[in-house]
Amino acid sequence: MIYKSIFIDLDDTLWDTYHNNKECLEELYTDYHFNRYYASFEAFFDIYMPHNLDLWAKYRSGEIDRQTLILDRFLYVLRPLGIEDKKTVLSVNNDFLQRTTTKTRLVPGAIELLEYLRPSYRLFILSNGFREVQFKKLSNAGLAPYFERMILSEDANIQKPHKGIFDFALKNTNSRRSESLMIGDSWEADIIGAYQSKIDQIWLNPEGLPAVGFIPTY
């Protein structure tokens, strides 16, 4: 198969979302004195993280919108402290988002992969992330020069894994389905989404999770 266009997920495929976000949350924990309410940062993180992942899954499926996600993820950990004011919660979220744009830790091998691909392929980011942070993250981490364009779910008005965002990406990059490839870490969003859109896939799977329902292309 001769590929010409490669679509790559950003979060946890290139940009180390887990560690970068954890670092930001630890800064918030210190700066907002959450230690007055939680026994440790890890106790705070262990409550926040599963809830945040659940919210993102609901966002991908269309069960909730962006505003619900960004409000509820911090409201969930602040409500037990007696903090339910929407303005305060959104302020904490905005602070968190701003901090994420300054973090530059990459997934091991990310630059080497892009250096290998850039001479031979057209490269695009395909992400469910938010516009106000994704471009800054890409630029500050030194990744922007590798890509022709970033396609966001906010542009397509639909999230991965839905077929519509893949169709949107193909149309807006003048790419052919048969000559395109999707690289990502999320089995549901990236791999199932691309598979159902009849786009070949490379699954970044460092944890060695089992494929369910079909075998990815690579």
Cite the ranges covered by each PLM segment.
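Asp-based, Mg2+/Mn2+-dependent phosphohydrolase catalytic module
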Residues: 1-6, 19, 111, 115, ...
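N-terminal helical cap/lid subdomain that shapes the substrate entry/recognition surface
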Residues: 2-108
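Conserved SAM-binding loop
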Residues: 14, 106, 123, 158, ...
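Structured helix-beta-strand junction loops
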Residues: 51, 119-120
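Glycine-centered short loops/turns at secondary-structure junctions
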Residues: 120-121, 198
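Short beta-strand/loop segments at the ligand-binding rim of alpha/beta enzyme cores
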Residues: 121-124, 177-179
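Conserved phosphate-coupling serine/threonine residues in phosphotransfer and NTP-handling enzymes
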Residues: 127
